[in-house]
Amino acid sequence: MQEQYRPEEIESKVQLHWDEKRTFEVTEDESKEKYYCLSMLPYPSGRLHMGHVRNYTIGDVIARYQRMLGKNVLQPIGWDAFGLPAEGAAVKNNTAPAPWTYDNIAYMKNQLKMLGFGYDWSRELATCTPEYYRWEQKFFTELYKKGLVYKKTSAVNWCPNDQTVLANEQVIDGCCWRCDTKVERKEIPQWFIKITAYADELLNDLDKLDHWPDTVKTMQRNWIGRSEGVEITFNVNDYDNTLTVYTTRPDTFMGCTYLAVAAGHPLAQKAAENNPELAAFIDECRNTKVAEAEMATMEKKGVDTGFKAVHPLTGEEIPVWAANFVLMEYGTGAVMAVPGHDQRDYEFASKYGLNIKPVILAADGSEPDLSQQALTEKGVLFNSGEFNGLDHEAAFNAIADKLTAMGVGERKVNYRLRDWGVSRQRYWGAPIPMVTLEDGTVMPTPDDQLPVILPEDVVMDGITSPIKADPEWAKTTINGMPALRETDTFDTFMESSWYYARYTCPQYKEGMLDSEAANYWLPVDIYIGGIEHAIMHLLYFRFFHKLMRDAGMVNSDEPAKQLLCQGMVLADAFYYVGENGERNWVSPVDAIVERDEKGRIVKAKDAAGHELVYTGMSKMSKSKNNGIDPQVMVERYGADTVRLFMMFASPADMTLEWQESGVEGANRFLKRVWKLVYEHTAKGDVAALNVDALTEDQKALRRDVHKTIAKVTDDIGRRQTFNTAIAAIMELMNKLAKAPTDGEQDRALMQEALLAVVRMLNPFTPHICFTLWQELKGEGDIDNAPWPVADEKAMVEDSTLVVVQVNGKVRAKITVPVDATEEQVRERAGQEHLVAKYLDGVTVRKVIYVPGKLLNLVVG
């Protein structure tokens, strides 16, 4: 064994060994308990970032630990390879998305291997290959036949100059990111999957997910947004149709003073025929971004349509306005407004001078003060005719019942959740397998024409999708009849909704899933990824699992038992102000800093001499140029050091502050472990440990070893507090470094301790542990070694610490044998000088003794 720890030499050797031995490849084995550990698959952007490294290190630690417990552990990896960034990169680099993507996959695969992650590479998949997306296409056609897929028009962001659809992130300040043209909202036909048919199950089954974070479950509950309310129909004077609205607050209905409809509503369109102001407003609404978050913060605007609706209970005429905060695709495209008791309605009414009628009393029973804002709390009704004096629940039921009896109301359960629009007007995605025949019939692509393959050898112009630009691509024939293929592609959330299941049978050619393999491995035991995926990906992931279950492919209700959302990785951020007043962000690697005595940054400059402004720690990002390249760190310190720092610096679900000083600390610790093993093995063979012949000091050290095993096992296995597990191993190492190594039993005990330390560190730092295990054992492979088990007998304390008080004040702490009697404890306490001086010349009136813990002598 060489004296110096040289990670650059040992890590590549160990990685080669894993590759050659196929150490982490697994197959179904009914004789073993399975464990499926999965990290969210990466988008092949070109390089790994520290967020990836943190996510995958957590997964690898858990997988390696479970493997050492003797379980059959599946830990696969793949590539979420379709998506918009590849199109932009292809245009920029004058290539096609496919070669750019495959090059990135090859590069990032090497980076993953360099970090020593124990993946089953035989199951690697890329979602952009026909071998993968063919089954998604087939499944979509089956959902269509079941009535779970339909086509309808829906609003998109449209660039009139480029004649193309834009994703929300391609709209910057209301303009096209490419040509700066004002973006419009346009209705185009799109494909939808009926996720709303599963809304109740998606909501109720959240209660089964005991090991998912409450924050994620709450976000999903709110997103699904189940509400109970009443659908109310209004007659409209001089208009052929009625207006229908939905409300969750029928108790406030007597305070409804106007209705609002979407700009695209037929009533608004009709009114605009003779109203130029309204027509201009409808035109303006076409330029409103579709994203719901934008809707919430934008200025609320509207125009009176001139139509009057009739309040069903009071008979009063109330105005109907067109408003930009009402969307056609949400509900009926019309809402009732109660400005006295809804803040948005209040602001709109105040702006346009509309009537505000209070109908709920304040908490103290007085009339509410509506001079500044609406009263949104529930309460007792007034100003509401026959319903006066009713509380919220009674009023809800009474008004709902009356509207129902009159035939103008109906109790309804509503969902905020909308059906999943899966059409994208992009090129780099899986083609949607639908065709339109010459006679206009729309039908799924027949099985014998699947997969519908996306051509990869294309030229990108950055505007139109190559499969839309090439009229020949869409042409096909079905049963001898000419037909046109759909040129939209799937939302890339489709691919990431079922990849976890395909990992169980990636080579299977008879269908989407091999049920036998899928049911052996599924559900996933732990799924690791960022909380930013809480509602989109993680909801579609759950939905797809239920679709596959109902197709008979899997027999579980939920895809993952446990979800672990890792925290973000933060780093220092610095900038200087350029000549034009713009911020130039400088990488923390290039910042020369001065710190105060507490280690805080007080001054910074870069190599060019710019005075830098330090903005504190923020999420590693391209925009702030504060990302740290994992590859540079691995080359400098080794993969094991980077992994150890990632797991030690912070609890897994909290933010992690990148500090190179902390990385250096992790590296020093591994050098200490190496040095101790080197010094131990240099002394030659070790005798067997004779537990019965140990001295008190040796027993105490052995007790520490086994207590550490117990703590680390609990911290990794049950609590998943990996940082405290590492801290416990470090503490033990400090004790081992000071332990005597001269005697035969000293060395035998050190051998037992080091074998335990190396196994406990193995999930975190597998390369160094692989090497040290071979040095300590002389044979075998740590990847097949079992996790150390704490010896209960070794942990039994021979002695205990007793606190000695005189008149309730602590005067000493004494060590006594565990089986000492009260008399023996009193005698031992009396020998303590600090106790004896308080007993001198006084009488002990009372003795309070808590065995093994406390002795209180009451004197007077």
UniProtKB/Swiss-Prot annotation:
Example of a GO cellular component annotation carried by this entry: cytosol
Recorded GO MF terms: aminoacyl-tRNA deacylase activity; ATP binding; leucine-tRNA ligase activity
Pfam families: Anticodon_1, tRNA-synt_1, tRNA-synt_1_2, tRNA-synt_1g
CDD domains: Anticodon_Ia_Leu_BEm, LeuRS_core
GO biological process: leucyl-tRNA aminoacylation
Domain of life: Bacteria
Motif placement: 'KMSKS' region: 619-623
Endpoints of the signal sequence: none
Stored Gene3D superfamilies: 2.20.28.290, 3.10.20.590, HUPs, Isoleucyl-tRNA Synthetase, Domain 1
Binding residues annotated for ATP, in chain numbering: K622
Catalysis: reaction(s): tRNA(Leu) + L-leucine + ATP = L-leucyl-tRNA(Leu) + AMP + diphosphate
InterPro entries named among the record's database cross-references: aa-tRNA-synth_I_CS (IPR001412), aa-tRNA-synth_Ia (IPR002300), Leu-tRNA-ligase (IPR002302), Leu_tRNA-synth_edit (IPR025709), M/V/L/I-tRNA-synth_anticd-bd (IPR013155), Methionyl/Leucyl_tRNA_Synth (IPR015413), Rossmann-like_a/b/a_fold (IPR014729), tRNAsynth_Ia_anticodon-bd (IPR009080)
Motif window: 'HIGH' region: 42-52
Subcellular location(s) of the protein: Cytoplasm
EC number: 6.1.1.4
Sorted UniProt keywords: Aminoacyl-tRNA synthetase, ATP-binding, Cytoplasm, Ligase, Nucleotide-binding, Protein biosynthesis
Family assignment from sequence similarity: Belongs to the class-I aminoacyl-tRNA synthetase family.
HAMAP family: Leu_tRNA_synth_B
Record PANTHER family: LEUCINE--TRNA LIGASE, MITOCHONDRIAL, LEUCYL-TRNA SYNTHETASE
This protein's name: Leucine--tRNA ligase
Naturally occurring in which organism (per UniProt): Shigella dysenteriae serotype 1 (strain Sd197)
Record lineage: Bacteria, Pseudomonadati, Pseudomonadota, Gammaproteobacteria, Enterobacterales
